[in-house]
Amino acid sequence: MLDIRFVRESPDVVRADLRKRNDLEKLAWVDDLLAKDSQARAMQVKVDELRRRRNEISREINEARKAGKDTSALMAEARDIPRQIKEAETEMEESRNKVHYYLMRLPNILDDSVPVGKDDTENVEVKRWGEPVQKDFEIKNHGLLAVEHGWADFERAAKVAGAGFYFLKGNMVLLDMALQRFAMDLLVKRGFTPVTPPYMMNRKSYEGVTDLADFEKVMYKIEGDDMYLIATSEHPIGAMYQGEIFEEKDLPLRLAGISPCFRREIGAHGLDTKGLFRVHQFHKIEQFVFCKPEDSWKIHEEILANAEAVFQQLGLPYHVVNICTGDIGTVAAKKYDIEVWMPRENTYKEVVSCSNCTAYQATRLNIKVRDPKDFESKRYVHTLNSTAIATSRAMRAILENNQQKDGSVLIPEVLRPYMNGLEYL
C-alpha cells in the first residue's frame, strides 16, 4: 500500500496516477482519505489533551481538598472526561479504519516508463527473440497430441476433480520435472536460494502481498479456516519476512520459489479450453527479491534477463511487452510480460510476468531495512517478482513449437540431461 505520509505530502501525484490509470472511482477517494486522516489526527490530539487534563484535574482536586476549597466543579469535569475520551477514540478509530481501507486498495504509483493504455491490446512490445516457427504441416492441438500419446488424461481428471485439471503421465511427467529443475538450476547459478513455501496462507498475510478485493475471486479458500491455497509462491515468500528489519549487508536477498499453484478462475478462451495453458493447478518456479530501494530498477532488468534466459535456452521464440496502465493491476509499479510464440494460433501468449512492486508490498507487510550509519533510521525495502517458468504453459509451447510431422516432439537440448538423455517425446 501507499505510505500515508506520501499521500499527505504528494496528493497530486496520487491523483495524477489514478487519472493515468483512468480509475475515477479511486480518484474520488483521495479527498475523503485526506479528510479522514486529518480527522483521525485531530481526534488523537483531542484524546491526548483530555488525558493530560484528566491527570491535571486529579492534582487540582487534591490541592483544592488540602486547601479546603469546593471541588464539585472539578469533580463534575473529571466524571465527564471518560465519556469525552471514549467519543473521541471512537471517532478516531472510525477515521483510521476508513483511511486504512483506502490505503489498502489504492494502487501503487506507476513508473514514468509505463505506457498509457486502456487494456492488454495497448501493451507495448520492447523486444523480440527468435524467429516464429512456421510448419509445413497442420500442428495438432497440444492437448489432443498429449492424449494420443498417453502423456495426459483430461477426461479421467475431469471425473476426479472437474474441468481444468489433468493427469500427466510417462514422459510428460519427466518433462514437467525437467523444466522445474532446469529453471531452478539456472537461478541457483545466478545467486538465488531455493525455497519451498507453505502451500496455504492466512488472510492477514495474503492481504499483505496483494489486494484481495481483486485477487480473491481467483483463489481457493479453505472452508472453515482463515486459509487460502496459494496462487503462486510469490505470495508466501513475499510475506515471509513481515514485520522484520533487514540489515543492508543482507540485501539483495534473491529467493527462488518452487511450488504448485492453485487458481479458481481459468477462463474459457477458444483453443485454450482443453489442454495445459489455462488450468486450476500447475507448477511454477518463481523469482523473488528483497532489495534496497535504490537497487530495484537494476534488479528488475536482471530478473527479466533471467526469465529470458530460460526461454532462450529452451529455444522458444518470444517477445517482451511493457504492460500498460489499463492492464498492470494494483501492486506493480512496472511490469513486463514475456509472451512465447504459439504457432498453432499464430500468436504470442503470456508465460512470464515480471514486476517491480517498489515499496508497495513492504509497506503493507512492514518490512524495512536499517540504515547502517543510524541504528534508529529505517526505510521500506523494495520487492520484485518474476516467473522463471510455469511448466504447464512451457509444455504447451514445446509441444507446438517442437512438434514433428510424425507427431513426435523434439525435447529441447538443455532438458535432455534431466530426462535420461531422451531426444524425442
From Swiss-Prot:
GO terms for molecular function: ATP binding; serine-tRNA ligase activity. It catalyses: tRNA(Ser) + L-serine + ATP = L-seryl-tRNA(Ser) + AMP + diphosphate + H(+); tRNA(Sec) + L-serine + ATP = L-seryl-tRNA(Sec) + AMP + diphosphate + H(+). It comes from the Archaea. Keywords: Aminoacyl-tRNA synthetase, ATP-binding, Cytoplasm, Ligase, Nucleotide-binding, Protein biosynthesis. Catalyzes the attachment of serine to tRNA(Ser). Is also able to aminoacylate tRNA(Sec) with serine, to form the misacylated tRNA L-seryl-tRNA(Sec), which will be further converted into selenocysteinyl-tRNA(Sec). Homodimer. The tRNA molecule binds across the dimer. NCBIfam families: serS. This is Serine--tRNA ligase. It comes from Methanocella arvoryzae (strain DSM 22066 / NBRC 105507 / MRE50). The gene is serS.
